[in-house]
Amino acid sequence: LKREGIIAFFSKQRTILVLYVLLATALSLSNFNKGQTKVFSGDTKYTFYNNYVIFKHSFFHLQQGKDLYVLFPETHWDLYKYSPSFSVAMAVFAYLPDWLGLLLWNLVNVLILFYGVRYFIKGPPHTIFMLWFIFNELFTSVLNSQSNPMIAGMLVAAFTFFEKDKVHWAALLIVSTFYIKVFGILAALLFLFYPNKWRFILWSAIWTVAIGLLPLMFTSTDGLIFQYQNWLRLLSEDHSGSIGYSFMGVLQTWFGLQSGKDVLVIVGLIITMLPFVFVHKFKDLQYRINWFASLLIWLVIFNHKAESPTFIIAFTGIALWLFTTSINKTVLVLAVLAFVFTSLAPTDLFPASIRHSFFEPYAIKAVPCILIWLYLNFQLIKSGLNKSHKIFGIEK
């Protein structure tokens, strides 16, 4: 009876919600209390919530007409890389004391992810397992005050809105992710699965313009054009930077491949688009879920700037697939690999010597995600070929 009671307690969505909130609260206060003691380079010390400081100050820089996309070493380390519109959203937090603003920022991220998964089209008990499965990965992202949980939650919610034929809300969420991190716009490909395609395109255009012009509340037209020009410049320059925990990172560190990043991304896009050939599968919910899960993984492993906190997006995709699909030996092995080497590898469960000498330089965190992405797309294409002799709805 006690065992059943414990299982029932931890199977309640309210229990998980409380734990998510406690996670955000504890990590926020812990990082705040560490003060300015973190050194990224040189002798200057910054906070342990540097990302939040970057986001917060972007609003003040927008107001002051400063170039958002240059370094401000007097307040924070690294560059601001999101859109001018995102800096407007940070107005909600900008005037709050850091301890409160940081707490609310992390709570917003955690709650958007929680409710995005909570209201996923499949519902309980699938969502209960999903929320537990991603908990540790969420820890890593919140620890870094990142926006990735928000992006994951918004994209999952967009999928659910598509399923419920609420394309205006799906469009809003997808366009919003674009103004946070550009790659989120690829989720717009979901519209190919559903009717009312022109309605989605129209709403996407409306939201793109509306959100894109938000900074005009705090800057002039010329000032906004200036910021967007600088943002585009940063994105173009940023593309030639590091390879991160990405597919390219694995190919480079494992096999010595030093070039071909653009080719790899194009090949990845082609593979991602192939399942749309099988129009007859569009009515299959699991087919749509699997493709969406594959996309969430793609957004990370083909992102040359992918860092450990980014993987909450890919891991959410893995959770959506794992707890809605039929379990076989291959699926089980892939799930264990993902949980151990993607989610647990950066933690203290593994000695620091192994993490720094093996896991990090060889981008081990990305490997299970790459394997699952390949497996998912193989299954999608195999399913499309085996179940029908039609391609693009036409008999072969």
Predicted segments — roles?
Residues 307-322, 366-367:
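Hydrophobic/aromatic-rich transmembrane helices and adjacent perimembrane loops
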Residues 31, 35, 322-396:
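Aromatic-enriched
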